[in-house]
Every structure is written in structure tokens, then in C-alpha cells.
Amino acid sequence: MDRICNEALLRKVTTPRAAAAHIKNGMTVGFSGFTVIGYPKVLPAELARRAEEGEELGITVITGGNVGDQLDGVLARSGVMKRRYGFQGNRDLRALANADRIQYVDTHVSHGPYLIKNGYLGKIDVAVIEVAAIRADGSLVLPFSVGIDDTLVKYADKLILEVNEAIPLEVEGMHDILTLERAPHTQAIEIFKPDDRVGSPYLPCDPDKVAAVILTNCEDTNQDLPAPTPDMEAIASHIVKFLQSEVAAGRLPNPLP
């Protein structure tokens, strides 16, 4: 509880089951996470449980990038995920999409905020955001990824926050979050040297939009990569030989940077 410094949000702490009840059949739900980091890990299991117990529950899922199996895999295998926007790398989700059991749109990771802000993905009913902590003013300390969290928090009708105690509090201060306006009102990003900061280390959040807060203690899962095949090793060898020949011919610097 010491990670939640806002009194109003402290009163909204509840169980995963109660928090998941805010998500209904047919909703569009945005989830935090990027590069298999900073995604909700507890609430998806509650949604899967409801479906496995016979409830009719199907949702559209939006993420800013690749997330872990506790989200994509769990929702895909349980049948909760009916449509998915954003990059993904889950084997089960991919198989179900290729079998036409999940409608999948492979939107580029840079296009998510634009599509959401301009209404191309429809209304976002709920956004589920993993955070390291909540400050006294309600602003959020994000984990090791930001992705499209700022867009989801701003445009979703309702928010559910997963406060993950497994995230080290030292993450506070590492981010520089700048939310741009909708086109054609997008402003310039005034970064001219490496130490320029143009945004905030924290993500502003309206406490009135938060429907529920749940406490978790879950590590991010690393994606298992397959062992290299002979073809993969041959490709890598060809690339190395090509670069070495380019250096020898004087077309690339020696040593390579």
C-alpha cells in the first residue's frame, strides 16, 4: 500500500476479480506494455477465468507493442480475445489469427497513438495500466516501458491500475513523457542535445477516471527464443563475411563502430 500515495486511489484498491468486473463483453480494452515489459499480468487471468467458466466474454485488445504470454497468450487461448491491434509475438495468438479465429491487424508500433487519437479504432472503454507507484497528485510512475500508455490513459473512458511491487522504485525519474496533440496540431519535439528533456518523468492521470486499483507482485516474462537453425547460422555467417569483405575493400571503417 505504501506505493499508493493518493488517498482517493487508495480507497479504490480491490481484488482482481472485482476489478475485472468492469470489463464487459464487446468492449475495447487497451493494455499497457511494450517489448514484453510493463504489461498487466493479473487482470487478464481473471478475464480468462470468466470465459472458461462459461461466461460469454469477447473483447478487442489494443497494445502499444509486444507483451507477455500472461496477457496475449492467456486471452487468446481462453477465447476472450476476438480482435487484436498492435504488434505481437505470441505463438498461440499467431496460430489463432492465421486460423481466422482472432481478427488481427498488424499496425505499426508508431501508428497506435495516431489511430486512437483520431478515432480509427473506435472508443476505448477501459485501459489497464501497470505502474510502479502512484504519486500524491494521482500521476503514475510507469515501469520500464511507456509505449502508448499516455494515449490510453487520456482517451480511455475508464482506467484500471495494476500496481506491481516487483518493479524497483528506482525506476522513478527515468522517463521523459511527452504527449503530442492530434494532427494537424502536433507540436515540434524540441530535443536538440542528448540531455534535453521535453516532458515529465510522470504520467498525469485523473483519479476520477480510475475505476479500480489492484496490487500485484509479478515479474515480466522473457520471451523464449528458438535455438538457431542451420539456415539461421548460414545467414549470420554470410552477413559477417560480407561486412569483413567491405572493410577489407575500404568501403566500411576499420574497425567497425
Show the residue positions of the predicted features:
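Conserved alpha/beta enzyme-core scaffold
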Residues: 1-257
